[in-house]
From Swiss-Prot:
<dbReference type="GO" id="GO:0036128">
    <property type="term" value="C:CatSper complex"/>
</dbReference>
<keyword id="KW-0067">ATP-binding</keyword>
<dbReference type="GO" id="GO:0005886">
    <property type="term" value="C:plasma membrane"/>
</dbReference>
<comment type="function">
    <text>Molecular chaperone implicated in a wide variety of cellular processes, including protection of the proteome from stress, folding and transport of newly synthesized polypeptides, activation of proteolysis of misfolded proteins and the formation and dissociation of protein complexes. Plays a pivotal role in the protein quality control system, ensuring the correct folding of proteins, the re-folding of misfolded proteins and controlling the targeting of proteins for subsequent degradation. This is achieved through cycles of ATP binding, ATP hydrolysis and ADP release, mediated by co-chaperones.</text>
</comment>
<dbReference type="GO" id="GO:0009409">
    <property type="term" value="P:response to cold"/>
</dbReference>
<dbReference type="GO" id="GO:0140662">
    <property type="term" value="F:ATP-dependent protein folding chaperone"/>
</dbReference>
<dbReference type="GO" id="GO:0007283">
    <property type="term" value="P:spermatogenesis"/>
</dbReference>
<keyword id="KW-0346">Stress response</keyword>
<feature type="compositionally biased region" description="Gly residues">
    <location>
        <begin position="616"/>
        <end position="628"/>
    </location>
</feature>
<keyword id="KW-0206">Cytoskeleton</keyword>
<feature type="binding site">
    <location>
        <begin position="271"/>
        <end position="278"/>
    </location>
    <ligand>
        <name>ATP</name>
    </ligand>
</feature>
<feature type="region of interest" description="Nucleotide-binding domain (NBD)">
    <location>
        <begin position="2"/>
        <end position="389"/>
    </location>
</feature>
<dbReference type="GO" id="GO:0051085">
    <property type="term" value="P:chaperone cofactor-dependent protein refolding"/>
</dbReference>
<protein>
    <recommendedName>
        <fullName>Heat shock-related 70 kDa protein 2</fullName>
    </recommendedName>
</protein>
<dbReference type="InterPro" id="IPR018181">
    <property type="entry name" value="Heat_shock_70_CS"/>
</dbReference>
<dbReference type="GO" id="GO:0005829">
    <property type="term" value="C:cytosol"/>
</dbReference>
<feature type="modified residue" description="N6,N6,N6-trimethyllysine; by METTL21A; in vitro">
    <location>
        <position position="564"/>
    </location>
</feature>
């Protein structure tokens, strides 16, 4: 454990998140205040407060338009992205565009607010950080955060920014399947048998990754990775929701689509049915008064569910084939197939995968919901210098998921770094001018596998100016690509003759939050946090005065006190209690000090009378009323 306190590992998921810490030589996956080891990645805004996690998900049907989830499907993407546009059809909340970036729009405390996906994710991260702090009994400053292996550069950078907004020092961004491989590898430590080829099949709530690693003596080397950053359990839910909404329309001639609350209740029922279908062959759905007073009772079979998602399920095998090709391995050379992510519990997916590998047994030894956070916690411990023997000789060699290069004449993509190159890495290539006396070159950086840049993703661009006039082909411009351990790219271009250089951290110029934006969001996050705390204190003060009032009322109405308290005193207390109860009904939203003041007012009336009780019945004892209530003394 370092002097800075422990570092945590956070699996920031599309639908659920999970946090772990490595201490005393083992990983603890930390339960939240509800006792759950995973926390919904949900943030809700109401007239009075902001809710995160279980509390947010539990009220989603009552407040569908202001409850945000799936931020991971927005993060690092542009508003025009086809996936964003198609997701918006399923989301009950509003997504708007600001400078080409998507933002969610909600009503909070009576005002319209908009948030970037990074801000929503940072709220979920804040919740995970607080869960860890409650368990560890102290502040947490540093964390390793995981992302899908197939996340591109902008999605990685945006996730890192979310961590910064939370106030965390993000030690490293690591890939989810790699983190899961650590969990698997540590679990198997000490088993004999040298190098092992392991395929991690990670299908979660919103993303899908396949990674192939070789594991030997604590060295985890990723050979290839493939996936789909937009495929997961949510998509299987969507198929069922559409199917059942159609059935409702057929049976009852009513379309529930415009009613967001009805759609949300149907989605919750579908999610539950989907889980049931992993262990049973049929699930019943019963929703009272789904729409316009009509109950919806139906059932769905496992076979029907599999048919609705047949294409999506089959589609999970394509990345498996691609990863095998890239790793130059035959499927017979894979020794272990490890399942990660909640959606791998679906029997059909297990069957397809097992059949693809000619009936080979799948490895289900690690917890699919917790493995990623487990691995992240181990990596966090290594990065802060934990000296436990279990993690000392552990080495992670990860890869970049997409080829990176620049545009050359004619819109051709010239890759400098090929996909599945081990990171960190640095590659330099020399380019030259295209026309005589050209004084500047535009360096445009792309990621992707297509031959022409127009089909790939532009990460950013910059000019290198001041090139001395010369015939075409003479100047030598050296372009260097440097990828750090987070998988984030830096590019420099230098003119060899003048030594002039220009550089850019590809943190996606177009989509990236500026430093000022991030600083502003850090302050806002602090402000929201203190507002949340103030609200918690306010509610506590309200509850305190409420319970005090009812307790006092019960006390004086108790039969046992008959004859010990005069009717006049009793009525005085009961009248005051009733007055406070009426005031509370009218002032549910008062400030903390108003509640405290009300409680003091009530105490001023009650304490002298209650003290008299303790001093021997009506009028007994000369206890002064100003003593401020009963004091307790030790009896010898």
């Amino acid at each position: 454990m370092s002097a800075r306190g422990p570092a945590i590992g956070i699996d920031l998921g599309t639908t659920y998140s999970c946090v772990g810490v490595f201490q005393h030589g083992k990983v603890e996956i930390i339960a939240n205040d509800q006792g759950n080891r995973t926390t919904p990645s949900y943030v809700a805004f109401t007239d009075t407060e902001r809710l995160i996690g279980d509390a947010a998900k539990n009220q989603v049907a009552m407040n569908p338009t202001n409850t945000i989830f799936d931020a991971k499907r927005l993060i690092g993407r542009k508003f025009e992205d086809a996936t964003v546009q198609s997701d918006m059809k399923h989301w009950p909340f509003r997504v708007v565009s600001e400078g080409g970036k998507p933002k969610v729009q909600v009503e909070y405390k009576g005002e319209i607010k908009t948030f970037f996906p990074e801000e929503i994710s940072s709220m979920v991260l804040t919740k995970m950080k607080e869960i860890a702090e409650a368990y560890l009994g102290g502040k947490v400053q540093s964390a390793v955060i995981t992302v899908p292996a197939y996340f591109n550069d902008s999605q990685r950078q945006a996730t890192k920014d979310a961590g910064t907004i939370t106030g965390l020092n993000v030690l490293r961004i690591i890939n989810e399947p790699t983190a899961a491989a650590i969990a698997y590898g540590l679990d198997k430590k000490g088993c004999a048998g040298g190098e092992k080829n392991v395929l991690i099949f990670d299908l979660g709530g919103g993303t899908f990754d396949v990674s192939i690693l070789t594991i030997e003596d604590g060295i985890f080397e990723v050979k290839s990775t493939a996936g789909d950053t937009h495929l997961g359990g949510e998509d299987f839910d969507n198929s069922m929701v559409s199917h059942l909404a159609e059935e409702f329309k057929r049976k009852h001639k009513k379309d529930i689509a415009p009613n967001k609350r009805a759609v949300r209740r149907l989605r919750t029922a579908c999610e539950r049915a989907k889980r049931t279908l992993s262990s049973s062959t049929q699930a019943s759905i019963e929703i009272d008064s789904l729409y316009e007073g009509v109950d919806f009772y139906t059932s769905i079979t496992r076979a029907r569910f599999e048919e609705l998602n047949a294409d999506l399920f089959r589609g999970t095998l394509e990345p498996v084939e691609k990863a095998l090709r890239d790793a130059k391995l035959d499927k017979g050379q894979i020794q272990e197939i490890v399942l990660v992510g909640g959606s791998t519990r679906i029997p059909k997916i297990q069957k397809l995968l097992q059949d693809f590998f000619n009936g080979k047994e799948l490895n289900k030894s690690i917890n699919p919901d917790e493995a990623v956070a487990y691995g992240a916690a181990v990596q966090a411990a290594i990065l802060i210098g934990d000296k436990s023997e279990n993690v000392q000789d552990l080495l992670l060699l990860d890869v970049t998921p997409l080829s990176l290069g620049i545009e050359t004449a004619g819109g051709v993509m010239t890759p400098l770094i090929k996909r599945n190159t081990t990171i960190p890495t640095k590659q330099t290539q020399t380019f030259t001018t295209y026309s005589d006396n050209q004084s500047s070159v535009l360096v445009q950086v792309y990621e992707g596998e297509r031959a022409m840049t127009k089909d790939n993703n532009l990460l950013g661009k910059f000019d290198l100016t001041g090139i001395p006039p010369a015939p075409r082909g003479v100047p030598q411009i050296e372009v260097t690509f440097d990828i750090d351990a987070n998988g984030i790219l830096n590019v420099t271009a230098a003119d060899k003759s003048t030594g002039k250089e220009n550089k850019i951290t590809i943190t996606n110029d177009k989509g990236r939050l500026s430093k000022d934006d991030i600083d502003r969001m850090v302050q806002e996050a602090e402000r929201y946090k203190s507002e949340d705390e103030a609200n918690r204190d306010r509610v506590a003060a309200k509850n305190a005065v409420e319970s005090y009032t009812y307790n006092i009322k019960q006390t004086v109405e108790d039969e046992k006190l008959r004859g010990k308290i005069s009717d006049q005193d009793k009525n005085k207390i009961l009248d005051k209690c009733q007055e406070v109860i009426n005031w509370l009904d009218r002032n549910q939203m008062a400030e903390k000090d108003e509640y405290e003041h009300k409680q003091k007012e009530l105490e001023r009336v009650c304490n002298p009378i209650i003290s008299k009780l303790y001093q021997g019945g009506p009028g007994g004892g000369g206890g002064s009323g100003a003593s401020g209530g009963p004091t307790i003394e030790e009896v010898d």
